[in-house]
Amino acid sequence: MAGHSKWANIKHKKQKTDAQKGKIFTKIGREIAIVVKQGGPDPEVNSKLKDVIAKAKAANMPNETIMRSIKKAAGEVDSTNYEEVVYEGYGPGGVAVIVEATTDNRNRTAGEVRHLFDKFGGNLGTTGCVSFMFDKKGVILIEKSDKVNEDDLMMKALDLGAEDFTAEDEYFEIITAPEDFSKVREGLEKEGYEFVEAEVEMVPQTTTTLTDPKHIEFMNKLIDSLEDLDDVQNVYHNWYGE
C-alpha cells in the first residue's frame, strides 16, 4: 500500500484523540447505536458491533461506557434515531475528501459540512464525485514494541487473510479486504495483539501533494473543523502530508 496517506492521517488523528477523548467516545457511541439497530445487541451474532467494540477499545473507551451505549441502543428509552450519510467533495488544491457522518437531522449536517467546504476553499460535490478514487479496506495498526516480533506478526496476519503488511516508523499497518477484516482482527486479538486502530476505512488509491502554503493551511483547517463537528464520524482524503 505504498503511497497512500494512512500514516499522515494516523498522526493527525492521534493528536485529536489525545485532546478530545470525550468527543471520540460520543461518536463511537453513535456508531454503536446504528449497528445495534441494524443487527442487535449481541456482538457474537452482530459482527459489525464486534468491530465497533474493537474500535472503541483501541480508543481506550471504558468497558462500562461501551456496555451503556449498547444497552441504550437496544432499548427504546432515551434513544435517538441516527442514520449514516456520506458527503464527497474537493478541498483546496483539488484534494479529494470523503466525510462520513451519523445524524438525526440531515439538513443540519449537510449545511454544516457545506459551510466548512466553502469557508476553506473547497466545494461539496455530488455522490460518487470522488469515491471512485478510494478503496474500502480494513486497516489495523499495532504499535511497535519489544513484545511484538515483526516476522511473527506478518506471518500471522497474512495467514489470516491480510492483503498487505507494512512497517511504519512507530506502527505495523495491516491492510485487509473489507470482507476479511473481522476474521483478521479477531484472529490477531486471540493471539493477544492490542490495536492502536482497527476499522474499515476509505483508503486513497493515489495521493496528491499541496505546495501553496495557503492551500496547506486551509486543508488542515478543513480537516480539523470537519472532525470537530459532532455529527462527523470520519474524514478521508488523498492529501499526502499534514
Curated annotation (Swiss-Prot):
GO terms for molecular function: DNA binding. GO terms for biological process: regulation of DNA-templated transcription. This is Probable transcriptional regulatory protein Cthe_2075. It is found in: Cytoplasm. Belongs to the TACO1 family. Transmembrane segments: none annotated. Keywords: Cytoplasm, DNA-binding, Transcription, Transcription regulation. It comes from the Bacteria. Signal peptide: none annotated. Pfam families: TACO1_YebC_N, Transcrip_reg. HAMAP family: Transcrip_reg_TACO1 (MF_00693). Its main location: cytoplasm. One of its GO terms (cellular component) is cytosol. The lineage of its organism: Bacteria, Bacillati, Bacillota, Clostridia, Eubacteriales.
